[in-house]
Amino acid sequence: MANKLKAGIIGCGGIANGKHMPSIKTLGETELVAFCDLIIERAEKAKAQYGTEDAQVFTDYKELLKLDLDCVYVCTPNRSHSYITVDALHAGKNVMCEKPMAINPAEAQKMLDAAKETGKILTIGYQGRYRPDSQYLKKECEAGELGDTYYARANAIRR
């Protein structure tokens, strides 16, 4: 692909290092050119493992947002998803934010409003809904196969 997307990662810890960066690297359509983490060593390690030769490293996400990037991945702790995403959208970046979208509906609405105001793409990593087991359960519920559900239990990774 001649014109690869230029992406930045904000938050180079667990989910970014374990899932996002390895997946992005295998796609071949996106170059990771910027890494930000409060722990500089994490960002430097991510650059060495997944970045382009000229990738940049930051501890302040606002400095990363000054770069000419097509998109940023927000992979930070849950409480920071909203304000980092809003800042990124206002900086003219498309955003893929890790789940959960925000810590409350008001923060989520700020994110939606910023995407609408800027005309930028905002996507949230709710990939679990496309898993075969999730799709099967959704289909069964919609078909009324489970009757009146009064209790459900699910397991998920939480921090």
Regions found by a protein language model. Give the residues of each.
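Short, Asp-centered acidic motifs that coordinate Mg2+ and/or phosphate
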Residues: 34, 71, 151
